[in-house]
């Protein structure tokens, strides 16, 4: 099921400003964005802040910033503007009050004065009796089929007693709709509660505000998480009460942990901001999230997609019903693919400011101008591409390319040093000093020629030289690493190292 011919596709992402953007929310935003863009339509961000008690100051701007960092830029929002604002629900209270009055006049909603204590007692009683907890309709007026006299309702209102407004769910009807992912779905109205529409603080509930806003903002498709599926009967009824055509709906599969338990907001590291702060690139994050429930087609093994490619290929027909497993190892794998493919010039632009900040704080012992040159950084990048997991590790995991080692891996030293290691190293330093062309090939040839008459294997020197020049016992090709570091730096570090290690 696609858009109705002639109808402009308009989708929306409507987060509550209660904190960071959960990765499930990012997926919802992405799928709405991709569907709208694949259909030549509009993507709207609307802030649903009707729960004022849980609102976090500044969260709405943080949410929007996270979306834009990952490339999900709305066509309309409280910042971008548009013809259907305001885009923050707390700025639309008059609109909701107007439509609430309409339902009261139509006898499809009613005032409820039940206290929190009464509601809780009723809930416990129903559960004890094995019933599904529902409002007991104590305040349903006689004229709407209930037992409460209009005079008692009027008296309570005149006293100024706190109240909520509830919808009156019709009895004994079937509520049916078509889900774009799950197909036809049917609910019995007997399972649907008389939902609160307006709270005692004058704010609407999510259910009431969202259907009004979706209608007034001409939202054509509502794409959201599976957890909202049970709310659809209330929403369908509200559309019928107002005589409005409901938007098409699609409910996305749950996100699951590798053990197939539900991924929860309360778990650590499930906020999109967490992944960004750890160094995952926006491209990898979006690629990863896109695959949480969607694939291009049967038999397609492709897993790396740019945002533009996703906009071209995305369809709700390829979104599954089963829960999607959230495996952060897959995100790590994708990040590696992007690092391998990213042009060196882009990486240089990203890491150079970080390196310059480091060099401003710490003495390097090397030519600082050379270290931040595109030529030098390009050589480091090509040596380290296969070894780093994040872009920032071209600096943090590769510090020996910029700073002399301050300490040496003790385990590596214990494993590689014997009685004559320093003596042989001292002799090899003289060989390096006399190596005119300090290239990887010449360094390798010189080392092998040096150890051969001494009846030692190249590894006898390879490992100590690596440890003294880098501080660690692992890394890229030693000969290429030494070439990049340069003759002066290598000899200085070796001389300094044998004065410290193996004594």
Curated annotation (Swiss-Prot):
PROSITE patterns: AA_TRNA_LIGASE_I. Monomer. ATP binds at residue 265. InterPro entries: aa-tRNA-synth_I_cd-bd (IPR045462), aa-tRNA-synth_I_codon-bd_sub2 (IPR020751), aa-tRNA-synth_I_CS (IPR001412), aa_tRNA-synth_I_cd-bd_sf (IPR008925), Glu-tRNA-ligase_bac/mito (IPR004527), Glu/Gln-tRNA-synth (IPR000924), Glu/Gln-tRNA-synth_Ib_cat-dom (IPR020058), GluQ/Sye (IPR049940). Pfam families: Anticodon_2, tRNA-synt_1c. A motif ('HIGH' region) lies at residues 15-25. Belongs to the class-I aminoacyl-tRNA synthetase family. Glutamate--tRNA ligase type 1 subfamily. It comes from the Bacteria. This is Glutamate--tRNA ligase. A motif ('KMSKS' region) lies at residues 262-266. The gene is gltX. Catalyzes the attachment of glutamate to tRNA(Glu) in a two-step reaction: glutamate is first activated by ATP to form Glu-AMP and then transferred to the acceptor end of tRNA(Glu). Its EC number is 6.1.1.17.
